[in-house]
């Protein structure tokens, strides 16, 4: 019979139980009681998620999709591959050790973090050196298998594959080629798979999403010998590709000595023919037809029509699946009592998507009539969504159609603008600033919760937030920062805040997804044409500016990031939606400028994240992404300084496009990479001003002034002092004030030291 399965389920819990358990554990100093509570929470979440999968009608549950912090880090823990610099005993690894690698400790900074392919999930980057070894690691996966079997479930295990694990890492300490470590890594995987077979696991899903990339020949050539070494003695192996088209590797993948393949038909439907043609008789083909990355309800009839010919060709060897892990969507639509009822009928979260997979399996096996009610409901929802009047705004469509190339460019060149801005602001060499947000304290959260619950009225809430702005301004003046921010106390999230104020967006109550570790985000839903009904940030920025003679930046989230960090409508091109958002932000920048705000930051941390995985598709994306930013930023006068911020980005390959944004100042995250990101600036003459991050805000570790001074001096080797800013890596929302106070005081001290050295080195 055709098998229904998913590639993974969200691990955070319907009420973010894992987040809160992690934070309690860290807050309690990793005590024995806190660890027991955390372990119990993880066990309960896994049991609940498997229950959802079973009750939906899936043929197996997935184990190994759970991780305490990150599934790449967990895979490293399973194969004894955590960075040697931490000095851990791989076979006796504790949770405290695991979290030290993720978050850093007093002796070592945290592992670097970057985006998982083109998603908004962040993984911890493996560190590989000539001395790297692999071997037996933690028992967590086997514990999960035992848990699932004890609950009566048929378990399919899931692992990040060896090729992907190596690809995702960075070579260090003279290692020339990561593939040189493959002969050491394969035996560790082989032993892991053999143990899974001994534990009674029939199938193991091996995630190899790198086969959706443009792979070098050496990596392609490594695939067959790797899986020839893994297959003997292992359970049946299902090699899973996702996130893009893997058809250029179809012949290679079909020839692997494995029991099945998985392909993503949501992101790359056209690849199906390349896989079905001459498909080996000894393999299953898992078709990812239910979207694992977006929240829109599946058009079941359309999906059934797509799968029926595959069933006719392959029979029971067709498996029905989600396109990728459901890690990227919220847990359960049932927890959205306040969402608009019509909109709700258009949606499916992880729990609903598991049922969509099973319903498609049932229709393929028993016929559509067996699940007619579910199919009819889905068809009605799809029809209503196509025709709903709430989606279309003729005014917005006219404004987008009227845009010209000139609307996306500043009136004057950077050199002219820079002179006007120097005259207006009179900033010192190496000006210091922050990225935007300050700690979201318990006081802020209590006030927001009281306001949402109706306990605190609107005026009371505004005064509470104004008090937090006053605190933020006073602290920044005490540190001695040159350019200030208002601290964003009123914002629960840099995208959701704007989504609440823009037409065409909807906000969920509990639509949380994991960004990294305990960090969760609640992406808005972009369901219709986007329009700005009234100013969003002017009041807060104006109030903050009234408290200081120093410039205060207005803070906006850019159009591409708004798009990337939302669940976006799929009934029009993403480029069109980006332009709609850009027009709304353009109006906001003009309103800020009119109110006297002279610096406006338009954050685009997700610019590179949106880059297509295929090189051939990138130029078109960058064209519309740069245009959207230009539309948002280019209406202001020469002496209004436009800032932008990017984080977690390795963007050497897109520096020309970043330069084309023509922001007066760009800040980037560089601390964890020890300024390696700036290597690209040695060969590319970036024309505008830049602030490489000198303080890793993702770790509780507080740097001292000497450490920050060293980073500033490293940056000066690549960036002229006249164009260098000093700032943290990212916003400070997740840190505590005691950490921020110490770190920013050290940052200002370090900047003053270096400023003095630079000025003394310049002849009078």
Swiss-Prot record:
Reaction catalysis annotation: 5-methyltetrahydropteroyltri-L-glutamate + L-homocysteine = tetrahydropteroyltri-L-glutamate + L-methionine
Entry keywords, A to Z: Amino-acid biosynthesis, Metal-binding, Methionine biosynthesis, Methyltransferase, Repeat, Transferase, Zinc
Phylogenetic lineage: Bacteria, Pseudomonadati, Pseudomonadota, Betaproteobacteria, Burkholderiales
The protein's Enzyme Commission number: 2.1.1.14
Enzyme class: transferase
UniProt similarity note: Belongs to the vitamin-B12 independent methionine synthase family.
Cofactors (names): Zn(2+)
Name of this chain's protein: 5-methyltetrahydropteroyltriglutamate--homocysteine methyltransferase
Binding site for L-homocysteine: 435-437, 488, 603
Source organism of the structure: Burkholderia pseudomallei (strain 1106a)
Cofactor binding note: Binds 1 zinc ion per subunit.
Annotated catalytic residues: 698
């Amino acid at each position: 019979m055709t098998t229904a399965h998913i590639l993974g389920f969200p691990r955070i819990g319907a009420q973010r139980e894992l987040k809160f358990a992690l934070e309690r554990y860290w807050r309690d100093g990793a005590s024995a009681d806190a660890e027991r509570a955390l372990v119990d929470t993880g066990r309960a979440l896994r049991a609940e998620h498997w229950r959802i999968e079973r009750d939906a009608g899936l043929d197996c549950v997935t184990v190994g999709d759970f991780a305490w912090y990150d599934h790449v880090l967990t895979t490293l823990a399973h194969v004894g591959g955590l960075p040697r610099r931490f000095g851990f005993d791989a076979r006796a690894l504790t949770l405290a050790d695991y979290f030290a690698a993720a978050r850093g400790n007093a002796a070592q900074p945290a592992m670097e973090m970057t985006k998982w392919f083109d998603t908004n999930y962040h993984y911890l980057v493996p560190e590989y050196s000539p001395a790297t070894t692999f071997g037996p690691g933690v028992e967590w996966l086997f514990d999960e298998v035992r848990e699932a079997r004890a609950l009566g479930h048929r378990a399919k295990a899931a692992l990040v594959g060896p090729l992907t694990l190596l690809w995702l890492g960075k070579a260090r300490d003279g290692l020339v080629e990561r593939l040189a470590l493959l002969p050491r890594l394969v035996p560790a995987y082989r032993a892991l798979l053999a143990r899974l077979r001994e534990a009674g696991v029939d199938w193991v899903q091996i995630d190899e999403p790198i086969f959706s990339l443009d792979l070098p020949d050496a990596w392609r050539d490594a695939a067959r010998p790797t899986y020839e070494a893994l297959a003997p003695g292992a359970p049946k192996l299902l090699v899973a590709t996702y996130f893009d088209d893997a058809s250029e590797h179809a012949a290679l993948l079909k020839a692997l000595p494995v029991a099945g393949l998985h392909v993503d038909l949501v992101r790359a439907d056209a690849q199906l023919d390349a896989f079905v043609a001459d498909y080996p008789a000894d393999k299953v083909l898992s078709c990812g037809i239910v979207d694992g990355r977006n929240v829109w309800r599946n058009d079941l009839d359309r999906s059934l029509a797509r799968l029926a010919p595959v069933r006719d060709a392959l029979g029971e060897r067709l498996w029905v699946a989600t396109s990728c892990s459901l890690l990227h969507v919220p847990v359960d639509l049932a927890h959205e009592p306040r969402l608009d009822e019509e909109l709700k009928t258009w949606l499916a979260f992880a729990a609903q998507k598991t049922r969509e997979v099973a319903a498609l399996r049932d229709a393929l096996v028993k016929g559509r009539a067996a699940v007619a009610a579910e199919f009819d409901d889905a068809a009605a929802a799809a029809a209503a969504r196509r025709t709903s009047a709430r989606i279309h705004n003729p005014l917005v469509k006219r404004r987008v159609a009227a845009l010209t190339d000139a609307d996306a460019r500043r009136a004057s060149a950077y050199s002219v603008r820079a002179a006007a801005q120097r005259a207006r602001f009179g900033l010192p060499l190496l000006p210091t600033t922050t990225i935007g947000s300050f700690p979201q304290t318990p006081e802020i959260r209590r006030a927001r919760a009281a306001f949402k619950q109706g306990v605190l009225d609107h005026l009371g809430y505004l005064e509470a937030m104004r008090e937090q702005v006053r605190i933020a301004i006073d602290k920044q003046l005490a540190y001695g920062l040159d350019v200030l921010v208002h601290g964003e106390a009123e914002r629960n999230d840099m995208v959701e805040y704007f989504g609440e104020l823009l037409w065409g967006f909807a906000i969920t109550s509990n639509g949380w997804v994991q960004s990294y570790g305990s960090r969760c985000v609640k992406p808005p839903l972009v369901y219709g044409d986007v329009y700005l009904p009234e100013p969003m940030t002017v009041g807060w920025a104006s109030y903050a500016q009234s408290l200081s003679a120093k410039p205060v930046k207005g803070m906006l989230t850019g159009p591409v990031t708004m798009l990337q960090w939302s669940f976006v409508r799929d009934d029009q091109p993403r480029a069109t939606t980006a332009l709609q958002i850009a027009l709304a932000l353009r109006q906001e920048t003009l309103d800020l400028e009119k109110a006297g705000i002279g610096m406006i930051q338009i954050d685009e941390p997700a610019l590179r994240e949106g880059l297509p995985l295929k090189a051939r598709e990138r130029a078109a994306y960058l064209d519309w992404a740069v245009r959207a930013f230009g539309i948002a930023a280019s209406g202001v006068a020469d002496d209004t300084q436009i800032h932008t911020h990017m984080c977690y980005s390795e963007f050497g390959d897109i520096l020309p496009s970043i330069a084309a944004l023509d922001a007066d100042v760009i800040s980037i995250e560089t601390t964890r990479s020890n300024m390696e990101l700036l290597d690209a600036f040695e060969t590319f003459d970036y024309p505008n001003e830049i602030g490489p991050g000198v303080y890793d805000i993702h770790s509780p570790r507080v740097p001292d002034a000497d450490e920050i001074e060293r980073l500033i001096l490293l940056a000066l080797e690549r960036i002229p002092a006249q164009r260098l800013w000093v700032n943290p890596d990212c916003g400070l929302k997740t840190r505590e004030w005691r950490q921020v106070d110490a770190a920013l005081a050290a940052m200002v001290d370090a900047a003053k030291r270096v400023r003095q050295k630079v000025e003394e080195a310049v002849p009078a």
